[in-house]
Amino acid sequence: MKNKIAFVAVGQAGGNIGQLFEDRGFNVLYINTSQEDLDTLEHAKYKYHIPGGEGCNKNRRKAKQLVIDDFDRIAAEIETKIKADLTFVIFASGGGTGSGAGPMLIDLLIDEGRAIGAITIVPGQNESVKAHIILTTVFQS
């Protein structure tokens, strides 16, 4: 089962959840615009830093542009690191990197003919209004 399912963990929240899966033996590729966040994933086997940003600070548009600018390298990372029958993309829908890059990466993987699932982390009741607005835009796109 662990060879048939893999994960692409996007952003800080996605990375935190991805670690739980990697700790249980699943293959996980961590993608983030923040090198600092990637550095907290001490035992991660595969990490990719999207250049040009040190986090997106709830700026979904910035994350989307960084993915567009680095699209070929991100696609190559996924192609070489993620070999599975089913790939889940994990991302927060109320942040910056995850909410901007997560849906784009799902589209990339679907275009490659992969079977995809999404694990979307929604903002809690105590999170900012901005996080809830971002959530709405993620599900509208």
Task: Name every feature range the model reports, one short phrase each.
Residues M1-S141:
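Tubulin/FtsZ superfamily GTPase core signature
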